[in-house]
Amino acid sequence: MAGDVQILRRKGDNCCRDIKDIVNILMSRGFTNEFLSDHGDYYLFSVNKPGYDDDGRWYLDDASSWAVMYVHIIKDGFSIYTVEDASGQKTDYYRYIYIEGYGDRAFMYLNFLHEYFKLFPDDIFSGAADYLYTKEDIDRIYEKEIWSEIWHCLDPKTL
């Protein structure tokens, strides 16, 4: 199942300094070839793997070997989502990373998100069906023994 998804950031400091951390996460997962192109208000970032290693957990049930991400370094003029917490306080979230063609790379990206949220716990992930996932949701899904390959299309409360 293909679909584009995104990581949303609530603070307005989208900047290129975090790209280094994103690259480091992907490199630690076996991606060694990357391409970064500056488009002014966002970077087009793509990576791929040169080979396959069956010993790595991130390869289980996921035959993907490339990823395309658009990293927005300038905050959009309007928020993508406004989230209301239990106390009624509303928080605006802005697009930070747009991930192209999530689909059959669900486990690879779950692994990426698990590491990403260790560094940026206040960001949220917007799945293919516009469900919002917090760091806690991603951690819970990641730790499951059995998980659905379409987890990013399902309500995180049901997972």
What positions do the PLM features span?
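Short, extreme N-terminal segment that most often corresponds to the first beta-strand
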Residues: 1-46
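Residues that cap or initiate secondary-structure elements
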Residues: 11-15, 51, 77, 103-105
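Accessory recognition modules or surfaces
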Residues: 40-60
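Charged interaction segments
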Residues: 56-159
